[in-house]
Design a protein with these regions (language model features):
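Short aromatic/basic micro-patch
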Residues: 25, 49, 81
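Short acidic-glycine-tyrosine-enriched beta hairpin
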Residues: 40-56
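Short beta-strand His + acidic residue motifs that chelate non-heme Fe in jelly-roll/DSBH
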Residues: 35-36, 58, 69-73, 89
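Regulatory nucleotide-sensing modules
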Residues: 1-36
Length: 117
């Protein structure tokens, strides 16, 4: 069982905000989220859409740095918050999820590269 708090978001609600910081990864359990750079500005740009099974805030978590994107619920969305404290348990008990996490990271980095090029 993956430990962590579940959070629910309504369509249009901000899940994660650019430049904020939280040492946690969000596993999307239900719904979809849009990941944006410069959200709410004239330079706003959708980088990628995240669906159930995907992750949010991975790069910020691994680098212990503020977020470089904003995630917004595109429909009602539920996430599980995997904190630094329970990440080791997550890694040990969910080896298949770790491969999914790595695949997500790779796809996300590719999407961010396209957004900035």
């Amino acid at each position: 069982m993956i430990q962590g708090e579940e959070r629910q978001f309504k369509k249009g609600q901000i899940i994660l905000k650019e430049k904020s910081f939280e040492l946690a990864i969000y596993n999307v359990l239900l719904g979809r989220a849009g990941v944006y750079v410069n959200y709410g500005t004239p330079e706003e740009r959708l980088v990628v859409e995240i669906e159930a099974g995907d992750f949010l805030n991975v790069i910020s978590f691994l680098e212990s740095r503020p977020r470089n994107t904003t995630a917004v619920a595109l429909e009602p969305t539920v996430v599980r918050v995997i904190t630094h404290d329970n990440f080791s348990t997550f890694f040990r008990d969910n080896s298949a999820k770790i491969m999914s996490l790595l695949e997500h990271m790779s796809a996300r980095m590719r999407a961010l590269q396209r957004a900035y090029i």
